[in-house]
């Protein structure tokens, strides 16, 4: 069934929480040339329309081989339709017991995929760009600002040698895929006929092996080497795939020879990819390599507020602050925490407040209470820099103690829910302004001093492991 196939693809494209909460409950009805989706209520319908209908429409057109080019989203007002508690009006029972009604259409519920959407797929189901991965929906902060600015610059100088290839590296879940696909989406917006291909390293291997088995290697080469923009995620996963590495090496060279833009992502800096062919690693460094780091607390707050706004959720700032203080690893975990808070609030039929947030994140809070505290941070920092704990906490202001102390204060603010005065008390009774200054100093030194930044990242990994 078409909708079943579409659900399989949507499960791959969306997070587990979003898929389970918003997509799975939809009821589908297929006609000769259209697909109707029924949602439980107007709020649900509006959310799907604003956030997922374009993606669904692209997939439906693709999976039906062009037969279905119209997708409708309808409010299912039939008796027995389920409403989420938070959205259920007081008159629901009376309304449903009245005369039978037909599904009510909401405004602008029909999406007609543009003919140019075929460029996003580029003859393969794996070439789909996520329409939500745009620059306007990307939240910038100190940790990712350079990467975002570089990606925008690439658009104005596509294929220029100084940033070709563009290599984005950093831990998983920080927005590297969002940024690289934002370049693809922006290019297609400006030039609908541009040839853009997005793929993971794993899908490159699968497609290449499939082309060998089917005797279509030349077609595979032509598709990959006639692009304007090639986007490859998790390039480090090519390790050990010798035949695929050789093919990618020649594809890479062919595109660069034609000044076609390549953007790659990895969890490590190019020179750390020792398991890949040294010739390929060397070429990764020909252009520009930009790191993406875990977001600081201010950026985490803005990410939460923007995600909530885009989902039509009222998230008070104090609740966003609380979530940001507890979830520090990456953006995906932030989104998962927010989804859980929203789900609990809807289930209870209540507004989001600190009580709901604490209940939703009780497992996270329990884990953090056992693992990360100011005292634990002080111990790890003193051991890392090999200085006595009493000197880290004490009054001495010499550089050998002051820098680690500032770093420990910054990490305490970043990783715990403690206030500035509480952190100050833990560091020998210092006042809140001293802690604030230390946190500001940490943020500036991370940008200015590579050694300090490396120490910060090492300590963050130690504390989160």
Curated annotation (Swiss-Prot):
Location in or out of the cell: Cytoplasm
Renumbered residue ranges of the record's region Domain IV, binds dsDNA: 346-465
One Gene Ontology term from the biological process aspect of the record: regulation of DNA replication
InterPro entries noted in UniProt: AAA+_ATPase, Chromosome_initiator_DnaA, Chromosome_initiator_DnaA-like, Chromosome_initiator_DnaA_CS, DnaA_C, DnaA_dom, DnaA_N_dom, DnaA_N_sf
Top-rank taxon, per record: Bacteria
Region feature (Domain I, interacts with DnaA modulators): 1-80
Binding site for ATP: 173, 175-177
Region span, Domain II: 80-127
Keywords: ATP-binding, Cytoplasm, DNA replication, DNA-binding, Lipid-binding, Nucleotide-binding
Alphabetized GO MF terms: ATP binding; ATP hydrolysis activity; DNA replication origin binding; lipid binding
CC annotations in GO: cytoplasm; plasma membrane
Region (Domain III, AAA+ region): 128-345
Record note on quaternary structure: Oligomerizes as a right-handed, spiral filament on DNA at oriC.
Comment, domains: Domain I is involved in oligomerization and binding regulators, domain II is flexibile and of varying length in different bacteria, domain III forms the AAA+ region, while domain IV binds dsDNA.
Function: Plays an essential role in the initiation and regulation of chromosomal replication. ATP-DnaA binds to the origin of replication (oriC) to initiate formation of the DNA replication initiation complex once per cell cycle. Binds the DnaA box (a 9 base pair repeat at the origin) and separates the double-stranded (ds)DNA. Forms a right-handed helical filament on oriC DNA; dsDNA binds to the exterior of the filament while single-stranded (ss)DNA is stabiized in the filament's interior.
Family: Belongs to the DnaA family.
PANTHER family: CHROMOSOMAL REPLICATION INITIATOR PROTEIN DNAA
Protein name: Chromosomal replication initiator protein DnaA
Organism: Acinetobacter baylyi (strain ATCC 33305 / BD413 / ADP1)
Gene: dnaA
